[in-house]
């Protein structure tokens, strides 16, 4: 009997250990290569390749519907490759939509979570709810900067790291808001978009201190992730794809910009808990909305509708 109980306990211990490991990833900023490799590991772990959008061994991935815990941790490493003390920052991310819920200072295991994620807990941490939410509108207002034109390099990430590690209390301060804007961009947004990954990664091997500057086009991608996620699964070789001001003329153009999309036909991805201004980054509320092919172009329905209406008015 004791042997049976021991085996059962061992089985559950192994399962629990596997689950814990599966929820933890490392994002290594030591070099451009380690950074991209780390992103690809996370993408492959949570996404499934779309065979219809694949070229030369690179595919667009869709987030798996998954089961169990919807959170995973991203441990930041290599901000300063020569200083081990810069290895105590952990970001807690929702799996089904890649929203960063907050950060953990691993020196004391305090989890500083945004106000809109006040219900979120993570094993082994003590939660503190910040006074502001995670919407880009709130973060930009508190930070006093705009995402368009925001500069990020190794030095600014080091400063951001130190700001987060020195934070205490519930106030969403300017320094914390700025730091989270930067880290969300080079983690969650870089996971979603190769265009952002590509723009930032080259700064990691640049000794001159050159910065990645977030462009209006980059910001536009991030605000249309939900619409892109709804439309791109319907791509089957059409001449181009149109979503708002975004246009892709080939598979390679899609793959060069987008890496990972939402699973818009799984209910958890369609729950919008962000502020109303953030809704464009979510899947359409109606999970049945799909892309529309018109004149060999794959359209987002609202984009096509707006264009056809303008043509009707002008005719």
UniProtKB/Swiss-Prot annotation:
InterPro entries: Ribosome-inact_prot_sf, Ribosome_inactivat_prot, Ribosome_inactivat_prot_CS, Ribosome_inactivat_prot_sub1, Ribosome_inactivat_prot_sub2, Shiga-like_toxin_subunit_A. Gene3D superfamilies: Ricin (A subunit), domain 1, Ricin (A Subunit), domain 2. Its main location: secreted. GO terms for biological process: negative regulation of translation; symbiont-mediated modulation of host virulence. The keyword Zinc-finger does not apply. The record marks 273-274 as: Cleavage. It catalyses: Endohydrolysis of the N-glycosidic bond at one specific adenosine on the 28S rRNA. It is found in: Secreted. SUPFAM superfamilies: Ribosome inactivating proteins (RIP). Its EC number is 3.2.2.22. GO terms for cellular component: extracellular region. The active site is at residue 189. Residues 23-273 are annotated as: A1. One of its GO terms (molecular function) is toxin activity. Belongs to the ribosome-inactivating protein family. Shiga-like toxin contains a single subunit A and five copies of subunit B. PANTHER family: PTHR33453, RIBOSOME-INACTIVATING PROTEIN. The A subunit is responsible for inhibiting protein synthesis through the catalytic inactivation of 60S ribosomal subunits. After endocytosis, the A subunit is cleaved by furin in two fragments, A1 and A2: A1 is the catalytically active fragment, and A2 is essential for holotoxin assembly with the B subunits. This is Shiga-like toxin 1 subunit A.
């Amino acid at each position: 009997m004791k042997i049976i109980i021991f085996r059962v306990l061992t089985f559950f211990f192994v399962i629990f250990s596997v689950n814990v490991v599966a929820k933890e990833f490392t994002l290594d900023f030591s070099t451009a290569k380690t950074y991209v490799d780390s992103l690809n590991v996370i993408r492959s772990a949570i996404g499934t390749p779309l065979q219809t959008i694949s070229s030369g061994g690179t595919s667009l991935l869709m987030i798996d519907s998954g089961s169990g815990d919807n959170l995973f941790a991203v441990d930041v490493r290599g901000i300063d490759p020569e200083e081990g003390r810069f290895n105590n920052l952990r970001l807690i991310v929702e799996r089904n939509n890649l929203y960063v819920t907050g950060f953990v200072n691993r020196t004391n295991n305090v989890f500083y979570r945004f106000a809109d994620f006040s219900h979120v807990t993570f094993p082994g941490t003590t939660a503190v709810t910040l006074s502001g939410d995670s919407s880009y509108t709130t973060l930009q207002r508190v930070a006093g900067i705009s995402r368009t034109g925001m500069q990020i390099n190794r030095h600014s990430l080091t400063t951001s790291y130190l700001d987060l590690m020195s934070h205490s209390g519930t106030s969403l301060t300017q320094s914390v808001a700025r730091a989270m804007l930067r880290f969300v961009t080079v983690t969650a947004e870089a996971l979603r978009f190769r265009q952002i990954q590509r723009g930032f990664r080259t700064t990691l091997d640049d000794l001159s201190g050159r910065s990645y500057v977030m462009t209006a086009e980059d910001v536009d991608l991030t605000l249309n992730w939900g619409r892109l996620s709804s439309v791109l699964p319907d791509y089957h070789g059409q001449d181009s794809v149109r979503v708002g001001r975004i246009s892709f003329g080939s598979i390679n153009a899609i793959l060069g910009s987008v890496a990972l999309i939402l699973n818009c036909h799984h209910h958890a991805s369609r729950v919008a808990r962000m502020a109303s201004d953030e809704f464009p980054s979510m899947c359409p509320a109606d999970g049945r909305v799909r892309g529309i092919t018109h004149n060999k172009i794959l359209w987002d329905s609202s984009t096509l509708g707006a264009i056809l209406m303008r043509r009707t008015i002008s005719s």
